[in-house]
Amino acid sequence: YHEWFDRRRDPDGDDLVSIIHPWESGWDASPRWDAPMHLHHPSVHETHAARDAHMQILHAYGHDAQKLAADGYFCVESVEFNAIRVADLQALARIAAILNQPAGVWTSRAAAITAAIQQKFITPGGIFDLSGPDETPIQVPSSAPFILLFGACIDPATAAALVQQLKSDRFWPTYPVPTTPTDHPAFVGDHYWRGNVWMSVNWLIYTGLRTMGYTAAARELAYRRLDLVEQHGFYEYFNPITGHGNGPAQQSWTAVVLDMIATAQ
């Protein structure tokens, strides 16, 4: 699996893998993807139509990341995708140790990706995804950088700065953590991926806070999640200001709130 990523999704050999469709990130219609998808202030319908149309492009290009990037199509080195990959490699190393198998191959890959994350994603101006062969920063704020905590792939100073940003009003409204900050022009609390609370994203941030030692912030986030579900029910995603649930009711992944509460004690 990881060899496939290295072979097929790292055309420039910099240890950061690329995604070639917004769906691969899970953040389907995030404002982060507007520019690389050649969208300008899109409607919900326009983002949906663009994602569907992009599938035809992928088929035409044989899902070749290098060719897609060269011709200006969506090919993005995603902050949280690479952070999650580091966490996965670290988990494989722990499994290998339990099985008395060599863990070095996993730890060395995790270390290489961590170094690339720190060198390329983290800049004085912010932490941004990189688009295309020129690695153009996508300067759209989001909660994706907080998932670097989950990968434990940042130094303590960067972690402290991220937590300070996380606890700001724009990311810590009545029901944190929105995918797009509440003061951003693209924020729409009830529109799909334009600034909602997603339990899956919040679980990654919560786990990252615990991993990096920010247990008080993690506990507060867990109990705010419980409050959200108690007041507004189980839904796919929520408005961070009103708590209004959107998408399918009884969405299964919202049950991660149980893990958050169980481990926040």
Go through the PLM ranges and name each one.
Residues R7-D14, I98:
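Charged, solvent-exposed alpha-helical segments that act as regulatory interaction surfaces
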Residues A83-Q101, I147-A157, W203-T215, V257-Q265:
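Well-ordered alpha-helical scaffold segments within catalytic/enzyme domains
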Residues S78, D190-Y214:
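Peripheral, non-catalytic segments that deliver or gate enzyme domains
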Residues C75-A83, A103, T107, G195:
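Amphipathic, non-membrane alpha-helical segments in soluble helical-bundle scaffolds
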Residues Y1-R7, P22-W23, V76-L92, A96:
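Aromatic- and glycine-enriched pocket-lining scaffold segments that form the walls
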Residues S200-L204, A217-R224, G233, W253:
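Short amphipathic alpha-helical segments
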Residues Y1-F5, D88, L92, L99-Q118, ...:
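Extended, well-ordered alpha-helical scaffold segments
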Residues P11-E77, A112-V197, E230-Q265:
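Extended glycan-interaction surfaces of carbohydrate-active proteins
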